[in-house]
């Protein structure tokens, strides 16, 4: 299994040796040493989510890893998945972080995912998915969903809401810092961003906030009553 050498400056990963800045994802094992405290967005560390393993040095004070997932130190926030991540086994999870799932650079046949019960927050752009078939099940424990949380590119997408989650417009998430020039643009962005709305279906409780949200913002979806 291939390892990747990280370039680290003042605790920030600024580059990954052998990662492909032209759009080809890295593969193999990604080891995060103890001195890493942040990731530069231009480092191409997680492009395509194709790493097979994510391992964090136990002495790292900021990050941790479990079941091939990159997590906050306390294990409550999912920061990034890789090809072999098993999120369902992480019982401490409360937040799906920004860009935790990002497949926009390479289309997959399908993306089927049930968010673990106990998760409370879906951050800004938590799911940036490019797949022919998509199904995401949102449990009743989820109470807040940030803007652009579902950035889905698919010909057949289905989002199932089991509870009464609050979908937001213009909410940047728990950590995102936007430039002043971006605020007006992002304030117009809904939680569900989907370029082919006629191919999207939503299942949710009839009297839920999700149902009212879809009606209020004119999202072209079909809301059905769950049993």
Where are these regions (language model features)?
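Structural signature of tandem-repeat unit edges
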Residues: 1-14, 21-40, 47-69, 73-95, ...
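A structural signal for leucine-rich repeat
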Residues: 172-176
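Short, structured coil segments at secondary-structure junctions
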Residues: 217-218
């Amino acid at each position: 299994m291939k390892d990747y050498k990280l370039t680290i400056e003042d605790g920030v990963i600024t580059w990954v040796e052998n990662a492909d800045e032209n759009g080809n994802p890295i593969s193999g094992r990604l080891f995060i040493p103890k001195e890493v405290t942040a990731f530069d967005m231009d480092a191409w560390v997680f492009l395509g989510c194709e790493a097979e393993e994510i391992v964090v040095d136990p002495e790292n004070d900021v990050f941790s890893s479990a079941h091939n997932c990159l997590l906050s130190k306390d294990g409550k926030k999912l920061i990034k998945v890789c090809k072999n991540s098993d999120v369902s086994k992480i019982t401490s999870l409360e937040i799906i972080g920004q860009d935790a799932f990002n497949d926009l650079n390479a289309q997959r046949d399908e993306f089927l995912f049930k968010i673990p019960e106990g998760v409370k927050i879906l951050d800004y752009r938590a799911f940036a998915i490019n797949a022919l078939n998509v199904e995401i099940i949102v449990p009743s424990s989820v109470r807040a969903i940030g803007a652009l949380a579902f950035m889905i590119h698919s010909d057949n997408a289905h989002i199932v809401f089991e509870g009464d989650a609050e979908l937001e417009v213009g909410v940047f998430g728990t950590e995102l810092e936007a430039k002043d020039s971006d605020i007006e643009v992002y304030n117009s962005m809904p939680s569900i961003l989907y370029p082919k709305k006629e191919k999207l279906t939503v299942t949710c409780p009839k009297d839920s906030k999700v149902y009212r949200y879809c009606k209020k913002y004119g999202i072209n979806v079909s809301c059905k009553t769950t049993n």
